[in-house]
From Swiss-Prot:
Subcellular location: Cytoplasm
Short motif ('KMSKS' region): ranges: 603-607
Name of the protein in its database record: Isoleucine--tRNA ligase
EC category name: ligase
EC identifiers of the protein: 6.1.1.5
PANTHER family registered for this protein in UniProt: ISOLEUCINE--TRNA LIGASE, CYTOPLASMIC, SOLEUCYL-TRNA SYNTHETASE
Length: 1056
């Protein structure tokens, strides 16, 4: 090792101890000052890579779900930027809709639409506008701190006129294509916020609840003491009952109760569930098909709509949706409150009644319950049915029920007048376009999302609300209709100036009738905010009024990413609108992440305080750690993650600090030796250099392959494993080489290799851990002629496939395994690692692998501390090899043949087992079996306590320990104590020292026997051995013990 004072120091000194989080703050300032993000966006000579960012609401603080999606949206664009593309990243804000209105309603104690009109729609919308950017500062801080690069200074807002008129254009295009219609439809409805919800909104908040489950008797007309029975969990819908439905082909039965004489009709298959002891309780009178019941009439339960009997109500009809899975096989029909009810009654010509207002309260049409919320009226309705003699049985049922995802109140299903997108008209095109997209995980495309498309219903896109993009339809009493596509069009047709497109502005504007009839006024309602976010690919540019070229470059998106819930949200609405406009999916690749839960497996909750504050985690452990933790977890496979702060810390401890230590090791030793690279690492004849360069280039190739396919879950684990291999294998086995004096070629090549690896690693890791990558690159690349201002302005590394040496990689895997086996075996026989053993026998069937492994012997023999290594390819002499069926894999494939094939695998010959290990195929019971179908096991033959067996390699150890070997072991322990003293004294790595040692007995014998080894390894120039009773002198002194024997050490560093 060369004295650092005699050479220049090419690199900044690196302290082994580092505060990663503080260091990241410095890098953030560097990026801001040098405008690195802006530089990376330079489009000169580059192709455009298009990315759409789904807009969040700024009415809430960012949580781990946002951070996860944000990291994914950062990693992929960074990667493609380094691949030579320009990747515009424009942030957007979702401004309209229920989330904003809900906040205002809470603040102003608004409980109904009347309260809004009392406040004034303009004032209400001004209040909504005022909170849209409430947490935008916190969002900017968090997004910046996590290391995400996105343009938040020039965002789009869905409430901007330019955005809203693009949404109008989208609506107009669909309208002109006949894909917009007005009609009634039973939809999920939130009484908490007085508006309908889309199906995908309704699916977001299911809860287990207890509801009444009652069986009701409907008395048949002209059939004394005879009733047909129906079962329901929504008693509040019974005042609106207009029909009963049966299944045409279902067998029904008329029975007579022995106790009461009543005659009751129900499905024969459900008789035993209605009567627990049917044989004892009832007598069967008649069997009949459902067709025989159709047309019978019954008495209304309540008098409110009795006059509807003249219009065909209160009769039995047939419906395909009736089953015998539960209840009575007879379904009570309230067409205003059930989708199937609505369609069946419409088909039967029975008009609906809807005695429930927009706030979920009964109207005066049902005076006994008027003013009551529907669910609150259940008890009163049940009591009245009991009084009237219509209640047969009352139970309670526990079931999963949808709640409003905003107000957390139970949803009802309610017929509303709405405007719809005719999704069912374009369903086949939707499904076909989806087939052209790539999903990660891939099963979602044809699974969860594909299934959702298969069952797609027409989309109710109007909302009876205030803060949103108004429906752009004007019409008059005579039925003339105009659909407006822009502000300019509205101004032209109305002759009035239009400053804003919100309802308080446009509702004042009328359009003269082109035929001289009454003026056209805008229809009530605003567009679902999902329609706005689904229009984002067009509206973010103000297309088609402006930015036509920007839109064309960016459509369709190369990449989007959001959570699993968006398969029924943003991904869905994007697909509908893209298909409706251009018959094209608006994205090519989509990465779907799972849900981040609290560590206890529950949903993260502010009230429960069951998760750490994201900013505290970032400031404690750093953004790189959080990023790597998230993207190296099941959540990037759309699975759940139970968030653990310990998991983030483990990334710091196991990955980032190891990476830092490798970097620190290189920089500090290279400074001591004044090393500047020539760039010829690839010419190194050293086998460990060749191995690590092979690993590096294989890693680069894999990263390209998997990142191009957006499979982050196949990228990050390999990157992290490489960091571990770099520190635990390459540097560990090469450490003594860097300690040598001077600069022999082997040492120079090791420096060349480590520099090449660390600089390349900084580029490889840049998209994933942008801070550490920047720090290491800035320091290590400063000696390179073609260095960039930032690692993020570098190109992504490309693999040199000529450097791949799979035989070396296989040998090093075997070396790592045998080192572990050697340590474990020492522990088993109670011999410390410092004591040399005589012989280790390395056993593997492949003579070629053993021959390659022999080349690594100089590296692992010292680590294992054996004096002799023997290589034995005769595995059969030591090891029993067997195979067992991989039941989870084969069971699905083979079904009933599994037992026979499993037995065949168990009795398979060694020749066939080895054939499988070599990549071949074996036929058993007519089935082709490959390596993935079996589990191959190795076990020791006989009773050999000195044998340790592993799938990769096995060893046999000579456990003999002589007194001379014990002395050498003690000498190595003494060396370790001296090195600890040097470090405690804070000496430089290359400082020469004067050493004073006081000891006696076996320690003194070991010191005298191995004096040269101890002084050489510890850079000792002067050694004084003292009696144990003496006290050594030195700049640093300490007293310790080895195996219970006292040793005193004094160290002084010599002048340079």
């Amino acid at each position: 090792m060369t004295n650092a004072n005699t050479r220049s120091t090419p690199y900044s000194a690196v302290k082994p101890d580092v505060n990663l989080a503080k260091q990241e703050e410095t890098i953030l300032d560097f990026w801001d000052q040098e405008k690195i993000f802006a530089q990376s966006l330079n489009p000169e000579g580059k192709k455009t890579y298009s990315f759409y960012d789904g807009p969040p609401f700024a009415t809430g603080l960012p949580h781990y779900g946002h951070l996860l999606a944000g990291v994914l949206k950062d990693v992929v664009p960074r990667y493609w930027t380094m691949k030579g593309y320009t990747v515009p990243r424009r942030f957007g804000w979702d401004c309209h809709g229920l989330p904003v209105e809900y906040e205002i309603n809470k603040t102003h104690k608004i409980e109904s639409r009347k309260d809004v009109f009392k406040m004034g729609v303009a004032n209400y919308n001004d209040a909504c506008r005022s909170i849209v950017k409430r947490y935008s500062t916190e969002w900017k801080t968090t997004v910046r701190r996590v290391g995400r690069w996105v343009d938040m200074e020039n965002p789009y807002f869905t409430m901007d006129v330019s955005f809203m008129q693009s949404v109008w254009w989208v609506f107009q295009q669909l309208f002109n294509k006949g894909l917009i219609y007005e009609g009634y439809k039973v939809v999920p409805y939130s009484v908490g916020i007085s508006t309908s919800l889309s199906n995908f909104e309704a699916n977001q908040n299911y809860k287990m609840v207890q509801d009444p489950a009652i069986t009701v008797m409907f008395k048949l007309v002209n059939q004394p003491d005879t009733a047909i029975m129906a079962w329901t969990t929504t008693p509040w819908t019974l005042p609106s009952n207009l029909a009963l439905a049966v299944g045409n082909d279902i067998e029904y039965v008329k029975v007579q109760e022995k106790a009461t004489g009543r005659k009751l009709i129900m499905a024969q298959a459900l008789l035993s569930s209605v009567f627990k002891k049917a044989d004892e309780e009832v007598e069967v009178l008649q069997m009949m098909k459902g067709t025989e019941l159709v047309g019978l009439t019954y008495e209304p339960l309540f008098p409110y709509f009795g006059d509807r009997a003249d219009k065909g109500a209160f009769r039995i009809i047939s419906s395909d949706h009736v089953t015998t899975e539960s209840g009575t096989g007879v379904v009570h029909m309230a067409p205003a409150f059930g989708e199937e009810d609505y369609y069946a009654c419409a088909k039967a010509g029975i008009p609906m009644v809807n005695p429930v207002d927009d706030d979920g309260m009964f109207t005066m049409e049902v005076p006994d319950y008027a003013g009551k919320r529907v669910k609150e009226a259940d008890k009163d309705i049940i009591a009245d049915l009991k009084k009237r003699g219509n209640l047969f049985k009352q139970d309670t049922i526990q079931h999963s029920y949808p709640f409003c995802y905003r107000s957390d109140t139970p949803l009802i299903y309610r017929a509303v007048s709405s405007w719809f997108v005719a999704v069912e008209k374009i369903k086949e095109e939707l499904i076909a376009n989806n087939k052209q997209t790539s999903w990660v995980p891939d099963h979602l495309r044809d699974g969860r999302f594909g299934n959702w498309l298969e069952g797609a219903r027409d989309w109710a896109i109007s909302r009876n609300r205030f803060w949103g993009t108004p429906l752009p339809i004007w019409r008059n009493a005579e039925g003339e209709v105009m659909c407006i596509g822009s502000r300019a069009e509205l101004e032209k047709l109305s002759g009035q100036k239009v400053d804003d497109l919100h309802i308080e502005f446009v509702d004042k504007i009328t359009i003269p009738s082109p035929t001289g009839k009454s003026p056209l006024k805008r229809v009530d309602g605003v567009l679902d905010c999902w329609f706005e976010s689904g229009s984002m690919p067009y509206a973010q540019w103000g297309y088609p009024e402006t930015s036509v070229e920007d839109f064309k470059k960016a459509f369709p998106a190369d990449f989007i990413a959001e959570g699993l819930d968006q398969t029924r949200g943003w991904f869905y609405t994007l697909s509908i609108i893209g298909t409706a406009l251009f018959n094209q999916a608006p994205f090519k690749n989509v990465v779907v992440n799972g849900l981040v839960l609290a560590e206890d497996g529950r949903k993260m909750s502010k009230s429960l305080k069951n998760y750490p504050d994201p900013m505290e985690v970032l400031n404690q452990h750093g953004a790189d750690a959080l990023r790597l933790y998230l993207i190296d977890s099941p959540v990037v496979k759309a699975q759940e993650l139970k968030f653990s702060e310990k998991g983030v810390y483990d990334i710091v401890r196991k990955i980032l600090l190891r990476w830092w230590n490798s970097y620190s090791f290189f920089a500090n030793y290279a400074n001591i030796d004044g090393f500047v690279p020539k760039g010829d690492a690839k010419k190194s004849p050293n086998i460990l250099d060749q191995w690590v360069l092979s690993r590096l280039n294989g890693l680069i190739a894999n990263t390209h392959k998997e990142m191009d396919a957006y499979r982050l879950y196949n990228v990050v684990p390999h990157l992290l494993q490489f960091i571990e291999d770099l520190t635990n294998t390459y540097i560990r086995f090469n450490r003594s080489l860097f300690w040598q004096d001077g600069m022999p070629e082997t040492k120079r090549y090791a420096y060349e290799t480590l520099h090449e690896v660390l600089v390349t690693l900084s580029r490889l890791m840049a998209p994933f851990a942008p801070f550490m990558s920047e720090v290491t690159y800035k320091n290590l690349a400063q000696v390179l002629k073609d260095k960039k201002d930032s690692v993020h302005l570098e190109s992504f590394p490309t693999a040199d496939l000529s450097m791949l040496r799979p035989e070396l990689e296989e040998a090093v895997k075997a070396m790592d395994t045998l080192v572990t086996l050697g340590r474990n075996h020492r522990e088993k026989i109670g011999v410390k690692a410092k004591i040399p053993l005589n012989e280790i026998k390395i056993i593997h069937r492949s003579a070629e692998l053993l021959e390659t492994l022999k080349k690594f012997e100089p590296f692992f023999v010292d680590e294992l501390n054996f004096r002799k290594v023997v290589y034995n390819p005769n595995e059969d002499q030591f090891v029993q090899v067997t195979a067992k069926a991989n039941f989870p894999v084969l069971g699905k494939r083979l079904g009933p043949k599994m037992k026979a094939v499993g037995a065949g695998i168990m009795s398979m010959s060694l020749e066939n087992i080895l054939k499988l290990e070599g990549g071949g195929v074996v036929v058993i019971e007519g089935e082709e079996i490959s390596l993935s179908d079996v589990e191959i096991r190795r076990a020791p033959k006989g009773d050999n306590a000195n044998l340790s067996v592993h799938q990769i390699v096995s060893i046999e150890v000579d456990p003999t320990v002589t007194p001379e070997q014990e002395r050498e072991g003690l000498a190595r322990e003494i060396m370790r104590k001296i090195q600890v003293a040097r470090k405690t004294a804070d000496f430089q790595m290359d400082d020469k020292i004067t050493l004073e040692i006081a000891c006696d007995g076996a320690l003194l014998d070991a010191l005298n026997a191995h004096k040269d080894m101890i002084t050489g390894e510890t850079l000792t120039k002067n050694l004084n051995i003292l009696a144990l009773t003496a006290e050594p002198n030195g700049k640093h002194t300490e007293t310790s013990d080895i195996d219970g024997q006292v040793i005193k050490i004094g160290v002084t560093n010599l002048p340079r």
